[in-house]
Amino acid sequence: MKKPALFVASFCLLFLLGSAAHAQQFDLTFGVSGLTGDASTATLQTIGGGAYPTFGMDFLFYHHLGVGFNAAFRAKQNIFQGFQPFRPFFYDVDAVYAPPLGKHAQAELSAGIGAESLRFYTPFLTCGTFTGCTNFVSSNHFLGQFGGGLRLYVTRSFFIRPEAHVYLVHNQDAQFSGSRATRFGVSIGYSFKSYE
């Protein structure tokens, strides 16, 4: 009696997994963005400015819900307080909701957590046993991320996505004029879809 029940349970599980796999989507994106931040004060500068190359991916696995990862960094170093080169990096892992809007468009909403890594460059190398040698010191901050975009499909799989992301960075205001940064940009992407 146990073998038929096990067989039926296995068949049902296989059927459920097969139908879940039917509605999967994996996306890769590359783009460029600009960053704005709170206005400078008499003693602190803004984190805004510069071009930010971006990379992202997401995996939608249940009714257009899924998880994603985004990374953005300033392409060229900026100068901190008039003398020290620095470069910000933003990383986040998100929950993603991407419902279709007809045949050639798809909305994308995301919210998640991550980190901002501020790299302050020095004129000398610092070497460590496990880290090797680097010419920068990092200041890392926890962040929350909220974003949105609109995927406009130019083919079945290729899309262009205007996007905006708001970063709420914990303790960033110790070094810059505020704890908020907003990234606006455009990405191109490719969708690997198992359904249409």
Question: Regions from the language model: what does each represent?
Answer:
Residues 32-34, 130-134, 144:
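Gram-negative and organellar
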Residues 164-165:
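Internal, hydrophobic beta-strand segments that form the core of beta-sheet-rich folds
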Residues 40-43, 78-84, 130-136, 171-176:
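Extracellular loop and loop/strand-boundary signature of outer-membrane beta-barrel proteins
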Residues 27, 56-130, 141-144, 152-156, ...:
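Gram-negative (and chloroplast) outer-membrane scaffold detector with strong preference
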Residues 1-9:
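Bacterial N-terminal signal peptides that target proteins for export
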